[in-house]
């Protein structure tokens, strides 16, 4: 009832002045206020309603301060900056009745802020989320980067299609890696998602949508990515590389197997392979062979290595990482 009252009260005061909904519920007792961010911006008027049948003796405070901001069942505030955001609490006689946390979402020059996540710039600028799938099972992993280490939370939602969404279940985002980049530390977060009713052999007609809600202190931002599974396929490297010297020859036969994680049957979900011979020095010329088979014949020079990687045979998605074996 509290949330419904809050939204209705806010509409009655603000909707005539603005055609856009500038406050919305992120989750229980947490609301996002959308602000145009420029000097002397008027901000947004927000009406908070205490979730109680009581009518009298109610006071309001912000965060840990004991300063009384107002009294009565409702509190009207003008939200202009981060100092106006935070947790508003209504009390009566020393008892907490309810609270509402206000977060801010900034828009500057018509563009929503993207301060929390780092632009990965691959495959293009303004790429904040990257996703990969090892096969066509409907399972995929997404990850993002930030230089922020504390007071940070993420939540992830996903669906296939937006007009009639089909279910995709995502787990909790977790910190998966830390790296040092010059004077800064970089943190990688990732999430695993699974399409609920995936059909690996079916042609995709609707893209998968991934939405990440990011909150740092009192700042809210959201990031989205849209893709077909076929576009984010990256197989695991081939496994079980073996060399077989050929009699009276400098050549060897290198063989390998499909990765265990690749979709089956392999006669339908086929891979193509790149075989590379690399000398000890990276400046030496690389010899490469492309094949649809799981073996190839190459010249194996002393101190060289042979590497093999895989790609979907029928769709030009990403190559796998290399699997390698030394020539001697």
From Swiss-Prot:
Pfam family, one: IL12p40_C
Glycosylation, residue list: 135, 222, 319
Gene Ontology molecular function, alphabetical: cytokine activity; cytokine receptor activity; identical protein binding; interleukin-12 alpha subunit binding; interleukin-12 receptor binding; protein heterodimerization activity; protein-containing complex binding
Annotated ranges, domain Ig-like C2-type: 23-106
A biological process term (GO) from this entry: positive regulation of granulocyte macrophage colony-stimulating factor production
Disulfide partners: 50-90, 131-142, 170-193, 300-327
Record-linked InterPro entries: FN3_dom, FN3_sf, Hematopoietin_rcpt_L_F3_CS, Ig-like_dom, Ig-like_dom_sf, Ig-like_fold, Ig_sub2, IL-12
Record's signal peptide: 1-22
The record's account of how the chain is modified after translation: Known to be C-mannosylated in the recombinant protein; it is not yet known for sure if the wild-type protein is also modified.
Pathology noted in the entry: Immunodeficiency 29: A form of Mendelian susceptibility to mycobacterial disease, a rare condition caused by impairment of interferon-gamma mediated immunity. It is characterized by predisposition to illness caused by moderately virulent mycobacterial species, such as Bacillus Calmette-Guerin (BCG) vaccine, environmental non-tuberculous mycobacteria, and by the more virulent Mycobacterium tuberculosis. Psoriasis 11: A common, chronic inflammatory disease of the skin with multifactorial etiology. It is characterized by red, scaly plaques usually found on the scalp, elbows and knees. These lesions are caused by abnormal keratinocyte proliferation and infiltration of inflammatory cells into the dermis and epidermis.
Similarity comment: Belongs to the IL-12B family.
Protein name per the record: Interleukin-12 subunit beta
Classification lineage: Eukaryota, Metazoa, Chordata, Craniata, Vertebrata
């Amino acid at each position: 009832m509290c949330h419904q009252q809050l939204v209705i009260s806010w509409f009655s005061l603000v909707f005539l002045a603005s055609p856009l909904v500038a406050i919305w519920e992120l989750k229980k007792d947490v609301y996002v206020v959308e602000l145009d961010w420029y000097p002397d911006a008027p901000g947004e008027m927000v009406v908070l309603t205490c979730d109680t049948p009581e009518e009298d003796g109610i006071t309001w405070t912000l965060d840990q301060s004991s300063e009384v901001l107002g009294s009565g069942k409702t509190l009207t505030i003008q939200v202009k900056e981060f100092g106006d955001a935070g947790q508003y609490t209504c009390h009566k006689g020393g008892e907490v009745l309810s609270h509402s946390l206000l977060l801010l979402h900034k828009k500057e020059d018509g563009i929503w802020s993207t301060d929390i996540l780092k632009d990965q710039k691959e495959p293009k600028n303004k790429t904040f989320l990257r996703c990969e799938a090892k096969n066509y099972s409907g399972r995929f992993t997404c990850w993002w980067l930030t230089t922020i280490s504390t007071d940070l939370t993420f939540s992830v939602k996903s669906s296939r299609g937006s007009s009639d969404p089909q279910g995709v279940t995502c787990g909790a985002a977790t910190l998966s890696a830390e790296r040092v980049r010059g004077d800064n530390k970089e943190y990688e977060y990732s999430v695993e998602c699974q399409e609920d009713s995936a059909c690996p052999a079916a042609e995709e007609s609707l893209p998968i949508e991934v939405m990440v809600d990011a909150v740092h202190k009192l700042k809210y931002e959201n990031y989205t990515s849209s893709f077909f599974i076929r576009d984010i396929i990256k197989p695991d490297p081939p496994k079980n590389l073996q060399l077989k010297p050929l009699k009276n020859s400098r050549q060897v036969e290198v063989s390998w197997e499909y990765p265990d994680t690749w979709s089956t049957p392999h006669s339908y979900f086929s891979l193509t392979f790149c075989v590379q011979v690399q000398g000890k020095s990276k400046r030496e010329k690389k010899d490469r062979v492309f094949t649809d088979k799981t073996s190839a014949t190459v010249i194996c020079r002393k101190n060289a290595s042979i590497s093999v990687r895989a790609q979907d045979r029928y769709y030009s998605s990403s190559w796998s990482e290399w699997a390698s074996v030394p020539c001697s």
